[in-house]
């Protein structure tokens, strides 16, 4: 069972080959490799925390959140996807018309994250003994925090939520992603809202504090409730 640990609020500011099932998609099969997911609210300081970790040791490798895919921006080393060729900033579309785009965004966010987290590790990482790979969020928070919050707030219908849960469970059973631990960057909703305004990401300028409060409650329930189990 993966370990969970919470980090208190600090001063943080703001063509690769896919591994085939035959190679066991769970890359923790690499000897000595540890896989840790860093979780937290929007603007909790995850990117800064991960950058500091990466700079602190050559044994640390970071898989960042694929947000550029959601913004329709071609990031270095990635090919342009069919959705990008069609145009559209899906992150912005979700924030502007959440009920219309909730299912589309939550589906694509999870699938793009899954793709990023299943890429074959660089040789220098895979060959290094006792290395650790840190992930900016996981497919578990995609479901248990963001998608579930959309359902609870009425942005996802019962039918959409049931379909989401069905394919999400199937993918995790078919493409196992084991995590050895979860690090939770616990930050107050007010602080994350202030940081979000400060960093000035255009899509986030109208995000309400109440939305961050709801996400905070979901993180607390998932990561700090000892009775809760990942499904």
Residue ranges and their predicted role:
Residues 143-220:
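A glycine- and Lys/Arg-enriched "phosphate-lid" helix/loop adjacent to the NTP-binding pocket
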Residues 41:
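P-loop (Walker A) phosphate-binding loop of NTP-binding proteins
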Residues 46:
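Conserved lysine of the Walker
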Residues 38:
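Hydrophobic anchor at the beta1->P-loop junction of P-loop NTPases
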Residues 49-50, 54:
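Post-Walker A alpha-helix
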Residues 1-34, 68, 74-76:
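Extreme N-terminal, non-catalytic leader segments
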Residues 97-178:
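Glycine-rich phosphate-binding loop used to anchor ATP phosphates in small-molecule kinases
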Residues 55-105, 148:
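Conserved substrate/cofactor phosphate-moiety recognition/catalytic segment
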